[in-house]
Amino acid sequence: MNRRQFCVSAAAAGVAATAGAAASESALQTDGAAAASKPVDGAPNLFTPLKLRGVTLRNRIAMSPMCQYSSEDGFANEWHVAHHAARAMGGVGLLLAEATGVTPQGRITPNCLGIWKDEHIPALRKVTEFVSAHGGVPGIQLAHAGVKASRHRPFHPTPNAFVPLEEGGWMPVGPTAKRYGQDGPVPHELTAEEIRAVTAAFAAAATRSLAAGFRVVELHFAHGYLGHSFLSPLMNERKDEYGGSFDSRVRFLLESVRAVRAVLPEETPLLVRLSCTDWVEGGWTLDDSVEVSRRLAKEGVDLIDCSSGGASRQAQIPVGPSYQAPLAERIRREAGIATGAVGLITDPAQADAIIAEGKADLVLLGRELLRDPHWPHRAWTALKPASPPPIAREYAWALPETRR
């Protein structure tokens, strides 16, 4: 699977219960920055806690949002519970659910998760309850696929091809009536009123997320999906208040952040995933990401999840181990906001060094956690072999290495 394939009104009582649980955990931190944590009992840097507002992660390891393409009508099912459960028991600190459509048309495929209606809440709550019961923090990535919507899932006979309208597909939308790639219809260019409706959908989805038990919310503004397509000059050719200048191109992002932050309790962290550079001349740049991250910090965003690419097939991406960590490091240093590093982070020493050297506050693992849900346990053993790894008691009793 390539990286693009990885994407991936509440009851008042449910929201209040979620907010109360988060508030009781720890003192409120309101400056939007991650709290510095000293090593606990000589733990490796990767295993120090991370405090974001009123939520404390048990370590610096996060599961990157990865589409499972296993939903019907947006509903979570047993697969999603098992996917998250395995990694929560494996020791992951923050588990981010896949790109979850804030509208039916906001899904990448007909088989992606959704949170556009209240009926989605109970099934998602099964996921969050299990994660929370096993020491993980459940988070969700809210998304709209934009011009990349209505695609077949990657294990379909015609992977990633456009799903025709007569087969249950839908019309993609974007900032401009401009197609990404060669197949599928020309997207519908959103009106200003329709853009504001999507912003409202993000806020409504955030409210449902709280009712479902998610304690961290991330907005997906990367990889050529709707949010990123407004930011990138390669995809946004509008001439109104949502296109043209830098200030106009970041308007949709800032308005969405304000709308979501307004419905979240003060103790709930808000993350934003950015494609920090398009890797194409004339596109969105790292300088742009630094500047918008400064603005996001002032709007109450707590961490920038630093990815890249997705706006152009001509991108020259220097793929290699930790290749996006320098993006996270610069934004962390110059924008004064916590960051997450993602992309080909596979080795425990590599991940630990990213934290130790101040390149990022969090490391997000994708494929490596698909290969090994217990990667955190393996990482602990590699980094601190003389001490028993923090393994769930249901497993620990049977493993000699936990009784040293």
Predicted regions and their residues:
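Twin-arginine (Tat) signal peptide motif
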Residues: 1-5
